[in-house]
């Protein structure tokens, strides 16, 4: 029997994909999602496969583009511009990591905001400041979605965000503030993360440091959303994926904790599909379709 304190992503993923499919089934014509992979990065294949599977479930066409590791920045931008101009392309997904000579932020900026289904264009992230979260960064939006899943009322909630990256920590903090939560953001210069986390109703952690959050840093009954992904080597030499939270210890104290893997990840992919139908709605409102 599954531990009820584990906040699993799969049911949330399935609900969101079902909602997306209910929209796509009513649309006469919808463009395709295009995944761009640059260079040969084996771990990217897993993400692309998960996205393709989710797109199929949601009723969204999905294409894959593979660009060689020797492609130039200018060539990438030119190909992205062609996709921006192509009415058959609904949204563009830029897989990461990319080769060292490619400036990923520049390419994210090159994607038209209305085709930015990942929510990575600076315009998309900037919109969150104005409480426009329709196409927010997927991982940040997934964290907020999982907090909602607990049933906790966001208004007035004490939330501690551990990590302040541009694509997760900062957007998630702004999204939670837009919902009325009181948000404290901790980072590598914070003197005592534990001092803040112990008073939090919700802890969201995304720093990439295995088992950073232990049971002694969590208030009884709190919700803990773990976005971290780390590979550790066990004493027997085997490797495994863990989060930023010591899940086994923390679940004895917390009311909810997302496991890694199986927590935020599945929801992130579903949010990508939800962003896609929102992109379609905004493109239609902008007069892109006859």
From Swiss-Prot:
GO BP term (any one): L-histidine biosynthetic process
Protein name, UniProt field: Bifunctional protein FolD 3
Transmembrane segments: none
Species this chain originates from: Roseobacter denitrificans (strain ATCC 33942 / OCh 114) (Erythrobacter sp. (strain OCh 114))
Function: Catalyzes the oxidation of 5,10-methylenetetrahydrofolate to 5,10-methenyltetrahydrofolate and then the hydrolysis of 5,10-methenyltetrahydrofolate to 10-formyltetrahydrofolate.
InterPro entries: Aminoacid_DH-like_N_sf, NAD(P)-bd_dom_sf, THF_DH/CycHdrlase, THF_DH/CycHdrlase_cat_dom, THF_DH/CycHdrlase_NAD-bd_dom
Keyword NADP belongs to the record: yes
Gene3D superfamilies associated with the record: Leucine Dehydrogenase, chain A, domain 1 (3.40.50.10860), NAD(P)-binding Rossmann-like Domain (3.40.50.720)
Binding-site residues for NADP(+), renumbered to this chain: 163-165, 229
């Amino acid at each position: 029997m599954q531990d009820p304190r584990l906040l699993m992503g799969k049911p949330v993923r399935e609900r969101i994909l079902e909602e997306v499919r209910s929209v796509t089934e009513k649309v006469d014509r919808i463009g395709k999602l295009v995944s761009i992979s640059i260079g040969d990065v084996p771990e990217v294949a897993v993400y692309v496969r998960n996205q393709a599977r989710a797109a199929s479930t949601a009723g969204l066409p999905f294409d894959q583009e593979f660009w060689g590791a020797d492609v130039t920045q200018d060539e990438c931008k030119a190909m992205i511009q062609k996709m921006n101009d192509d009415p058959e392309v609904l949204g563009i997904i830029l897989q990461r990591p990319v080769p060292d000579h490619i400036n990923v932020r520049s390419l994210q900026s090159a994607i038209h905001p209305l085709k930015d289904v990942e929510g990575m264009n600076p315009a998309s992230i900037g919109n969150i400041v104005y409480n426009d979260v329709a196409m927010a960064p997927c991982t940040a939006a997934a964290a907020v979605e999982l907090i909602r899943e607990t049933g906790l009322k966001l208004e007035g909630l004490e939330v501690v965000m551990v990590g302040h990256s541009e694509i997760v920590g900062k957007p998630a903090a702004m999204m939670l503030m837009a919902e009325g939560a009181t948000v404290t953001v901790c980072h590598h210069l914070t003197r005592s993360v534990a001092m803040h986390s112990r008073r939090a109703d919700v802890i969201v952690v995304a720093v990439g440091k295995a088992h950073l959050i232990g049971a002694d840093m969590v208030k009884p009954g709190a919700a803990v959303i773990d976005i971290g992904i780390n590979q550790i080597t066990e004493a027997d030499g085997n490797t495994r994926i863990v989060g930023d939270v010591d899940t086994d210890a923390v679940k004895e104290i917390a009311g909810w904790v997302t496991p890694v893997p199986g927590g935020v990840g599945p929801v992130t992919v579903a949010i990508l599909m939800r962003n896609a139908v929102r992109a379609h709605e905004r493109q239609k409102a902008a007069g892109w379709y006859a």
